[in-house]
Amino acid sequence: MKKTALALFAGAFLANDVSALIYKAEETGTQIDFTGSARLQWRSTANKTSPVNGNTTRNHVNQAVRDNGSRFGFKITQQLGEGFYALGRVEWRFQDLASSQHGFDHLYDRHLYAGFGHKSFGELTYGNMATITDEVKQTDLANTLSLSDGLLPYAARHSIQYTYSGVEGLKVGAFYAGHSQRSSNGLDLSNELKDIWGVGATYKYKIDGKQSIKTGIGFARDRFEQANRPAYDRNAYALGLAYTYDKTTVGVDLERRITKDQTYVGNKRIEKEIRTVALQKLTDDLSVYTMYAYKENKLNAVSGQNDTKRRNNQFMVGSEYYLFSDYLKPMNLKLKAFVEWQSNHIKNFTNGNKSSRVRDNVTVIGARAYW
């Protein structure tokens, strides 16, 4: 007897804007998932800039409640038999291109890809997608003020990617993408991408029932076109490590990126990042966390141009709480609120001399619903 299951789950959040749809046809091996999240934030910023030769300026802004990267999309999986399957995904995201108060004025496709896979042989996909190098960092947090954007590419357009997860705890992959005039957020690049490729691997080892270690390592190289000049290239390296004991997780990321010949042949830019995180789950629903990052961006310019250096010490503390978990979990929904505070202590140098000092403080209160 043929069986076709159709499940529709709905939950209340922001006037019932959130819902989840799952379709599964057992006789055909087809499954369609409606995925996404609604994200809102209220943000307050305070800036103090103190030039060495000039007047100190201060600025304080309280923004209206606005979008914080809301998204929705579909995932499709088709079983082909003998362990093989086909898959596809599309995801749209909102972004603010018109300086509106709400931030919902523009919609673009963040993910759009398809491919084939096998649980023993890996997965091959093509399109606009997150890359394996996005998984290398081990300090990233899923809220707004995470300090771990990182130096490795997190996504690529018109890319082909292969990943393998046939060994327990291990995931390895590689990707390549050719020419693109747009970034992963759909906006035009100031210098068009000539090509990009990268490799990455993560491994999670479970020590016992309470302890585990996860590591990540990756490399990426991209090249960009320049008007009336040769293309310039960037090479990025990253290593991440995280340790979990019961409800406590600590992690560290080390990253470095070198850019050569940007703007002028002979220019060399070196970027370094050291990031740390500590997260403590107080209950199943409540967590507190903190991050620290040291970031350096140094330009060794050709003769006749200024050498520059920027040092940034970043601090962040935050807490998140999942609401109504017992009621929403049966409907495949999650609703959380969070509050975060970030402080940036920046020093700028020109030709070895300090040119300015900047203090940036940001506070965010947010809410997210996942389905």
Which residues fall in each region the model found?
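Cleavable N-terminal export/targeting peptides
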Residues: 1-29
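Outer membrane beta-barrel
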Residues: 22-42, 60-181, 193, 203-206
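Short coil turns and loop connectors of transmembrane beta-barrels in diderm outer membranes
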Residues: 28-30, 80-82, 120-122, 168, ...
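Residues that define the transmembrane beta-barrel architecture of outer-membrane proteins
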Residues: 30, 58-70, 107-110, 154-158, ...
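Transmembrane beta-strands of outer-membrane beta-barrel proteins
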Residues: 32-40, 82, 86-88, 124, ...
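Transmembrane beta-strands of outer-membrane beta-barrel pores
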Residues: 40-46, 92-96, 128-132, 176-180, ...
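Detector for outer-membrane/organellar transmembrane beta-barrel domains
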Residues: 194-322, 330
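Outer-membrane beta-barrel "beta-signal"
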Residues: 317-323, 358-371
